[in-house]
Amino acid sequence: HALAHTADTLMVFARSPHLDEAGLIRILKAIYEKMQAATGWIYVHGEDDRLARAVVTAFARETLTLDQIKNWLEVFSAGWKNAWTDEGQTRAYFNTRNLLRAIHIRTLSVKDLPRKEELSALILDAMTSMRPF
């Protein structure tokens, strides 16, 4: 459950006006690295929703370009071929898929989110590109 609390902290950092583009990229990279790693856990305590809040908070700042966001999302859909052959990678795949779903739902539900339609389309593309086999 520590990941959920870490996600809350990342959301506060992402909201800070003192955090620049490089800082937001570091947050997104850390989230990607955590989600891609093989794990013994399926996240069932709201970790995906809380990470999604951090991600969408970073997106809402409009500090990152749509191309930067697209590139970040694209790494989620790559590298899953044969993930189903390893239990840890299978769990990582489902955790990542659930995170992308949570980001998509959060994007659609936040009122007045800048670039909402563009972000939603990018997230949907990343979700539909994920293939574990």
Regions found by a protein language model. Give the residues of each.
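Terminal, non-catalytic domain-edge segments
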Residues: 63-133
